[in-house]
A protein has these predicted regions:
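N-terminal lobe/hinge region of extracytoplasmic solute-binding protein
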Residues: 1-35, 72, 159-160
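A structural "hinge/loop" feature
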Residues: 1-8, 27, 54-60, 125-138, ...
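Sec-exported extracytoplasmic/periplasmic mature domains
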Residues: 15, 19, 46-49, 72-80, ...
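Aromatic- and charge-enriched surface segment that lines or borders ligand/interaction sites
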Residues: 30-86
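Gly/Pro-rich hinge or "lid" segments in bacterial periplasmic/extracellular proteins
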Residues: 101-105, 112-115, 119-187
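Ligand-site clamp/hinge motif
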Residues: 145, 172-220
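A bilobed periplasmic-binding-protein/Venus flytrap-type ligand-binding module shared by bacterial periplasmic
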Residues: 177-180, 194, 226-251, 255, ...
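Structural transition elements
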Residues: 266-300
């Protein structure tokens, strides 16, 4: 989606993913992980500032407090952030999301201006990787408050912490730029397909020379598509050994389904299959049409 592509280029977080798939420091110099893997400490680079629209410098420095504010805002009940579920391992996350504890109780603190500490209630082996998600990007609280509810909705209310900055924002899309460096792309034009021209995403990109276009029409295209999805946790069996028995797998699967307890706080929902609720095919909800495919006690 155009908004996700914009976020990934306008904002940088604590870490970044390299071309070979590994994680490397981005806005931080380094990080440390405790032996029990419940505490992550990041040491931010000194002298970093946000960039305003048109590439103008800003007076807003990037500090540990910006990440604290971003994560606390993520878990405010009124924010309804889709990224809260990704960071459910943070200490007190469910209670904060449910409004049972204040945002300050969330497991993220600024020990020093450039020292950020995350505290987890249980280990999450994918925690570092999740810090590359748009929801984990820094946000200056003073600037956020100054926008009076328009943060990120106009060029004037958008600050960049990434390699690109917002050059222009019109009704048809966004234009991002960065300083020229070698053979690297120094501009991105992101157009949302909301016109009545009937053009597909591929036609918009080819005819209007756009970098990316949002299109939910489902029209086949030879262009690369970028999508995102929620996470489904499932129980998988190695069918090459003792679990080659279908009856045994069904028995264990039904037992696990009946024993699972969905955590409260609104972060999780029970899965009735790999395809979640809300996915429609020709206007028909797939999950409702297919039903619950999980084996039940007493199935032959």
């Amino acid at each position: 989606a155009a908004d996700v592509i914009a976020c990934e280029n306008l904002y940088s977080g604590l870490v970044r993913r390299t071309p070979d798939g590994s994680l490397a420091p981005e806005l931080c110099e380094r990080w440390e992980v405790s032996a029990d893997r419940l505490t992550y400490t990041f040491y931010l680079k000194d002298g970093l500032t946000y960039t305003a629209s048109k590439g103008d410098p800003s007076d807003y420095a990037i500090t540990a407090e910006d990440f604290v504010f971003a994560f606390q805002r993520m878990f405010l009940p009124g924010t309804n952030s889709p990224y809260a579920v990704e960071f459910s391992a943070l200490e007190n996350s469910a209670a904060v999301l449910a409004g049972q504890k204040p945002a300050s109780a969330l497991g993220v603190t600024a020990a020093e201006p450039l020292k950020l500490v995350f505290r987890l209630s249980s280990p999450d082996e994918t925690f570092l990787s999740k810090l590359t998600l748009p929801g984990a990007m820094p946000c200056d609280e003073a600037f956020f408050d100054s926008t009076r509810g328009t943060y990120g909705l106009t060029s004037a209310s958008t600050l960049s912490s990434g390699h690109f900055y917002l050059y222009n924002w019109t009704s048809s899309g966004l234009f991002l730029r960065r300083a020229a460096s070698g053979n690297q792309i120094d501009s991105l034009r992101l157009v949302e397909n909301t016109t009545s021209s009937g053009q597909s995403a591929e036609e918009l990109i080819n005819n209007e020379k756009c970098t990316a276009a949002l299109d939910d029409s489902g029209t086949p295209t030879s262009l690369q598509s970028v999508s995102y999805s929620d996470t489904t946790w499932a129980l998988l069996f190695n069918c090459d050994s003792i679990f080659a028995s279908t009856e045994l797998r069904q028995a264990l699967g039904s037992a696990a389904a009946s024993a699972v307890e969905v955590p409260g706080g609104g972060l999780f929902a029970e899965a009735k299959g790999l395809i979640p609720d809300g996915l429609t095919v020709d206007g028909i909800d797939y999950r409702q049409a297919a039903g619950d495919v999980r084996p039940a006690f007493g199935d032959p």
